[in-house]
Design a protein with these regions (language model features):
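Sec-dependent N-terminal signal peptides
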Residues: 4-13
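Sec/Tat signal peptide C-region and signal peptidase I cleavage site
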Residues: 15-19
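SH3/SH3-like beta-barrel superfamily modules
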Residues: 21-26, 49-82
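SH3/SH3-like (including bacterial SH3b) beta-barrel domains
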Residues: 39-53
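Surface-exposed beta-loop interaction hotspot
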Residues: 80-137
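Short beta-strand elements that form the blades of beta-propeller/WD-repeat-like
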Residues: 110-112, 191-198
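Mature extracytoplasmic domains of secretory-pathway proteins
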Residues: 131-183
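Structural motif
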Residues: 204-208
């Protein structure tokens, strides 16, 4: 009797764990070299687009997760075993943190990210019905209609002794950076670094991932963590 109860509880826990999907970034990883994104969580559902291997996506945590299906990029569904999570790669160790900076080092990688106070005199701000809707011509992320208090200042990155440049437009529309929530991952097989950060809070919250391949900045992806 006790054994049956134990097995039943184990079954429930396993099903619960399998059903829980934490929001986060992932890479398309399919033996066919691509994955189909479907309108609904069914193999018979309409294919709305195709994503190639190594494409960076954001998986949402919401009721749309169905059995072995994931809701990706707020567009459609992909099969759960067709991706590789960014957080599954090796972590690069955090080596320092202050109020406005955070540093990481390891695997011949050195990263320091700094922030600064937002100075509205240095920006072109557009309002709509008293809400901020454009900063320097771009839709701001990390805020919900109010003026930001902090912004990114610089990304100082060295990989294998060479500087990696992160262009300003890869972070100039991101506000309210959170120094204590930044993680760095390294995919050794593909020599790719991923910097994952959270910005803002409440309705303005965003998650961001910068992808650096073989020492060269490739792309940025953002997602809404709710």
């Amino acid at each position: 009797m006790k054994r049956n109860i134990y097995l039943f509880l184990l079954f429930l826990i396993s099903n619960y764990a399998l059903g829980q999907i934490e929001p986060g970034f992932a890479l398309v990883n399919d033996k066919d070299g691509y994955v189909n994104v479907r309108e609904n969580p069914s193999i018979h559902s309409k294919v709305i687009k195709r994503l190639n291997n190594k494409e960076l996506i954001y998986v949402y945590d919401e009721e749309g997760q169905k059995e072995n299906w994931l809701f990706a990029d707020n567009d459609g569904y992909i099969y759960r075993d067709r991706i590789k999570w960014v957080h599954s790669f090796d972590s690069v160790k955090k080596t320092g943190e202050s109020e406005n900076s955070i540093s990481f080092a390891g695997n011949n990688i050195s990263i320091t990210i700094t922030s600064q106070k937002f100075d509205k005199r240095k920006h072109n701000i557009k309002y709509k019905d008293s809400y901020v809707y454009l900063i320097d011509g771009r839709e701001p992320k990390g805020i919900d209609g109010y003026l930001p208090t902090d912004e990114y200042k610089d990304f100082d990155i060295t990989i294998d002794g060479k500087k990696t440049i992160i262009p300003k437009d890869a972070y100039s529309d991101l506000f309210e950076p959170t120094a204590w929530y930044v993680k760095v991952y390294y995919d050794k097989e593909n020599d790719t670094v991923y910097i994952v950060a959270s910005i803002g809070d409440g309705a303005g919250a965003r998650e961001v991932c910068w992808q650096i391949e073989k020492g060269v900045y490739k792309r940025r992806k953002t997602g809404i963590p709710f």
